[in-house]
C-alpha cells in the first residue's frame, strides 16, 4: 500500500507535476470518476481511498451526460483530502469549477461539428480566465467504438486499424502546440485502442499519449504501456469492479 502525505497544494502546478513524472520515465494512471454514476459520498470515499493508496496519479472528474455543476463541485470537494490533482475532464462548458486543480482543455479534433473543435472552447475561455483555472491543452481523438462521447461529439471515428490516420491526427496536435493527445475508444468500449496503433504513432511523434476506453485488465493495460502509452485512464472498471481497477494501477505503477 502506497501512503502519501495529504494537502499538497497543486493549483497552478498540475502540468509541471505530470511532466516531471513523465520526464522521470514514469507511466501514469488517471482514475476517471463520473459524478452522474456515483451513488453516495460513502461509496466515493471508499473508492477514492483505495485508488489513491495504490498509486493512481490523478483523479479525472467528468462525464458525457447528466453531470450538474453542483454534483461536480460535490465530488471534487470529497476528493480534497488527497494530494494528487483533481482534473476536470469536460464534455461541455457546464463542467467548469474553481474547486478543481486543473482542466483538460480539450479539442475534439475528429468531430464534424466545429462546436466541439473550437466553439465550446471560445465560449468557455472567458469563464476559465475568470475562475483562474489551470488549463492543459489536450487533443481529444476518438477511435473505434467511440461510445456516447462519439455520438454526442459527432466524431468521425478513426478505425481501430487505421494507424496512419491516427498518427496524422497526433502530429497535427503536436504541431498545434497541444501538451497531450488523448486517444479514446469510448466508455465501455468492447475493444481498447490497439497497442500496434500506439507503437506506430510513437515512431512519428513524441507527444505524450493518454489512452482510455475498454481497458478492463492489467494485461491489456501493460500491453498499452509497453507499446508507448504514457498515461492510462480507467473509468468504467472502477464503477463495476474496483478490485480490478486496483490491480491495473498496481501493474502500471510497478512497471
From Swiss-Prot:
Its EC number is 2.5.1.41. GO terms for biological process: glycerophospholipid biosynthetic process. It is an enzyme of class 2 (transferase). GO terms for cellular component: cytoplasm. It comes from the Archaea. SUPFAM superfamilies: FMN-linked oxidoreductases. The keyword Oxidoreductase does not apply. Pfam families: PcrB. Pathway: Membrane lipid metabolism; glycerophospholipid metabolism. It catalyses: sn-glycerol 1-phosphate + (2E,6E,10E)-geranylgeranyl diphosphate = sn-3-O-(geranylgeranyl)glycerol 1-phosphate + diphosphate. Gene3D superfamilies: FMN-linked oxidoreductases. Its cofactor is Mg(2+). Keywords: Cytoplasm, Lipid biosynthesis, Lipid metabolism, Magnesium, Metal-binding, Phospholipid biosynthesis, Phospholipid metabolism, Transferase. One of its GO terms (molecular function) is phosphoglycerol geranylgeranyltransferase activity. Mg(2+) binds at residues 34, 64. Prenyltransferase that catalyzes the transfer of the geranylgeranyl moiety of geranylgeranyl diphosphate (GGPP) to the C3 hydroxyl of sn-glycerol-1-phosphate (G1P). This reaction is the first ether-bond-formation step in the biosynthesis of archaeal membrane lipids. Belongs to the GGGP/HepGP synthase family. Group II subfamily. This is Geranylgeranylglyceryl phosphate synthase. The lineage of its organism: Archaea, Thermoproteota, Thermoprotei, Sulfolobales, Sulfolobaceae.
